[in-house]
């Protein structure tokens, strides 16, 4: 069972005032991305009925290439991830700040591709993964994720059902009772991931995560385009990805990430 959210919040956070009706209208009106996100989510949920966890061989056959090259990928990635200089997720994307403020533990993140928008300088740090991503454009997002010891990711839902989320653990500690430091709760079920074992799931289900160990936990995160969508949703999905790419360009995400990446070791 995951730690109760109240265990990781401060009294100030628990006393946070409720928003007024006017504030809620402003926050959820049609001029805000949340409004359109919920409409899109409804469209996908009406058309795509699937379990929370799916077979990697069916949803992401190319994951076999990752497993075949696992040792090289792990070695190259951990050289970067365990350097102590990985950018914090909330420093890259302000929208992720609430995930940091939940427990004030920085979630390390090195994006390699974001909804089809490539970060070549970051990919250059992990040559084996760079080669894989070049061969597989249907991997629309890829990132190196580092959870520090004790990190809790509060329950939330992903915004986009047009992709599968794939985890490949690279640095995970085995704990008592067959548990590990890579603990996920998805749709009420707890999973403990092991190093070198891929895991494919739908992150639009309510989920949370925690690292209960005294060591960092390093995982590769991929978003894989779903090929089981009806044709009209395929079009909507590509529009969504195109908008996400434009947004990253307008936010100067490459420049911001490269500034952070200057702290990283180079090959």
Please tell me what each predicted stretch does.
Residues 2-155, 231, 235-267:
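Fe(II)/2-oxoglutarate oxygenase catalytic core
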Residues 140-144, 164-169, 180-183, 198:
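Conserved active-site beta-strand-loop modules that form the wall/rim of enzyme catalytic pockets
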Residues 146-148, 159-176:
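Short, conserved beta-strand element in jelly-roll/cupin
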Residues 153-156, 201, 207-213:
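Short beta-strand His + acidic residue motifs that chelate non-heme Fe in jelly-roll/DSBH
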Residues 160-162, 183-189, 234-242:
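Short intrinsically disordered coil segments
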Residues 165-170, 200, 215-232:
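A short hydrophobic beta-strand segment most commonly corresponding to one strand
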Residues 170-195:
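A short beta-strand-loop-beta hairpin characteristic of the jelly-roll/cupin
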Residues 191-206:
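Conserved metal-binding segment of the jelly-roll/cupin
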């Amino acid at each position: 069972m995951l730690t109760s959210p109240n265990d990781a919040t401060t009294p100030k956070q628990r006393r946070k005032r409720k928003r007024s009706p006017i504030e809620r209208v402003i926050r959820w009106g049609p001029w805000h991305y949340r409004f359109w996100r919920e409409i899109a989510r409804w469209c996908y949920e009406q058309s795509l009925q699937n379990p929370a966890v799916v077979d990697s061989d069916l949803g992401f056959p190319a994951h076999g290439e990752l497993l075949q090259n696992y040792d090289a990928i792990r070695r190259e990635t951990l050289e970067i991830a365990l350097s102590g200089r990985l950018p914090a997720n909330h420093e890259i994307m302000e929208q992720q700040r609430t995930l940091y403020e939940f427990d004030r533990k920085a979630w390390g993140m090195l994006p390699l591709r974001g909804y089809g928008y490539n970060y070549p300088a970051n990919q250059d740090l992990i040559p084996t993964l760079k080669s894989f991503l070049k061969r597989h454009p249907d991997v629309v997002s890829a990132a190196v994720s580092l959870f520090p010891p004790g990190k809790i990711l509060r329950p939330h839902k992903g915004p986009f059902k047009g992709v599968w989320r794939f985890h490949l653990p690279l640095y995970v500690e085995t704990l008592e009772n067959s548990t590990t430091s890579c603990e996920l709760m998805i749709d009420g079920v707890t999973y403990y991931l092991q190093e070198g074992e891929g895991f494919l799931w739908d992150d639009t289900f309510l989920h949370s995560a925690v690292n209960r160990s005294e060591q960092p936990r390093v995982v590769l995160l991929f978003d894989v385009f779903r090929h089981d969508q009806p044709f009209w949703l395929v079009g909507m999905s590509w529009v969504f990805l195109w908008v996400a790419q434009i947004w990253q360009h307008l936010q100067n995400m490459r420049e911001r990430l490269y500034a952070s990446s200057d702290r990283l070791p180079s090959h």
